[in-house]
């Protein structure tokens, strides 16, 4: 079914760093009918993945030709409200949810197949089965799907760069400056809700300790204490980006 669907979208939610998963998705995303939306907290990085989720979706508008026919999702809950809305509106013909939980959450109101297994094993097996498949056998309609998203990604980048160049001093500008100076060995913790959303507006380095956020049910609790606990067991730099209310709340 993966090879037959003209438009495939993979969505990665909250997930711990896993080089095997990133490597498998790197291979899978070589297929030109496949695009990967990887939120910052997914800790997934590939050459073509889209991590600046909200700004790319904003630049995409309401073009229905971008709707996926096959959606494959894994990881925890998404940060991006825009991505949730986009996928609920898209109504993909099939949605495979890779989730060890039972029953699996139907976040996008489109779940057709619950694959009750761990994401790491699934993606390694999936990439292995596709190893001998050649992209040229895909339907002509699907050839440009990934390319369409990459063009929008580039457009969104240029719009963002122009906006930030003219932006005055603000929390958004401060966030941009901070991201430029975070050491590579860092584990980055972002508090709810503004910091973790800002994180997905900027391209930034892949930090050795991963990117994390305590996504509590009531919003702002736990970010500071989570980062403090993490720093006790992590040998590198632990950095928390938070706001005054969130810091005081904890």
Q: What do these predicted regions represent?
A:
Residues 1-4:
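Conformationally flexible catalytic loops at phosphate/diphosphate-handling active centers
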Residues 12-96, 104, 206-236, 248-250:
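Glycine-rich, anion-gripping cofactor-binding loops and their flanking helix/strand elements
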Residues 19-20, 81-82, 106, 125, ...:
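Phosphate- and divalent-cation-binding pockets in alpha/beta enzyme and binding domains
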Residues 14-25, 76-79, 119, 123, ...:
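Generic structural signal for well-ordered, non-membrane alpha-helical segments
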Residues 150-236:
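Active-site diphosphate/adenylate-binding microenvironment
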Residues 243-244:
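Active-site glycine-centered loops adjacent to acidic/histidine catalytic or metal-binding residues
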Residues 7-9, 70, 187, 237-239:
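Structural motif
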């Amino acid at each position: 079914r993966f090879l037959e669907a003209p438009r495939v979208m993979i969505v990665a939610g909250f997930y711990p760093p896993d080089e095997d998963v990133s490597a498998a998705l790197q291979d899978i995303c070589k297929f030109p009918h496949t695009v990967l939306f990887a939120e910052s907290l997914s800790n997934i990085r590939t050459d073509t993945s889209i991590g600046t989720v909200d700004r790319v979706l904003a630049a995409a508008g309401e073009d229905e030709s971008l709707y996926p026919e096959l959606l494959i999702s894994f990881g925890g809950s998404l940060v991006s409200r825009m991505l949730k809305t986009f996928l609920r509106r898209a109504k993909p013909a099939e949605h495979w949810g890779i989730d060890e939980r039972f029953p699996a959450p139907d976040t996008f109101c489109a779940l057709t197949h619950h694959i009750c297994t761990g994401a790491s094993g699934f993606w390694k097996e999936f990439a292995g089965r596709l190893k001998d498949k050649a992209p040229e056998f895909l339907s002509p309609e699907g050839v440009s799907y990934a390319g369409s998203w990459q063009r929008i990604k580039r457009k969104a980048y240029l719009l963002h760069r122009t906006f930030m160049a003219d932006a005055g001093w603000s929390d958004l500008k401060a966030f941009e400056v901070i991201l430029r100076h975070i050491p590579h060995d860092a584990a980055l913790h972002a508090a709810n809700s503004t910091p973790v959303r800002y994180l997905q507006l900027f391209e930034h380095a892949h930090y050795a300790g991963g990117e994390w956020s305590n996504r509590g049910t009531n919003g702002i609790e736990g970010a500071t204490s989570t980062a403090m606990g993490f720093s006790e067991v992590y040998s590198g730099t632990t950095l928390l980006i938070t706001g005054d209310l969130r810091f005081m709340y904890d």
